[in-house]
Amino acid sequence: MNVVGLILGGGAGTRLQPLTQERAKPAVPIAGKYRLVDIPISNCINSGIRKIFLLTQYNSVSLHQHIAATFRFDQFSGGHVRVLAAEQTPDSDGWFQGTADAVRRSIRYFMDDRPDIVVILSGDQLYRMDLSDIIESHIKNKADLTISTKPVDRAEAGSLGIMQTDKKGRIVNFAEKPGDTPLLKASTILALVN
């Protein structure tokens, strides 16, 4: 099974000002020598995912420098962490317009690796996770799309991507930042796609 990791570099990071004044959210230092982006990259590597792409756009120079200096695979492993920056092309004129647009515009670069599954992760969330379990569940359930969720309280729900699932775990309703809502399962920006 060929699994590729796709890590989202995020937007302006206004809630982390002044830390994001001159750097992308995933480049914010943690614990002295690490960056936020090191967590999802480590989750991928520790789960056996060796082909990783990082989508960037905002204040991304220090993030690019960190990736180039930190993540080097030997030439025989076939692994890599590659940065895919937003770019102007004949089909688009600049910045990514959200998560789906970032993935859509970058497909041509990671499809060269012919993945069976693409694991999409946020580049600025702190959690340790063995992705093997969710990949195994995705395969076992023959899903086209798997989205990780977490329960949230009503006060937090209105500012997140919120969904409702049926008894089989299938998504039946999804709303992005819906304001007041009775739905209390939030997307963690961890998704698997065939």
What is each model feature region?
Residues 1-194:
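Unchanged
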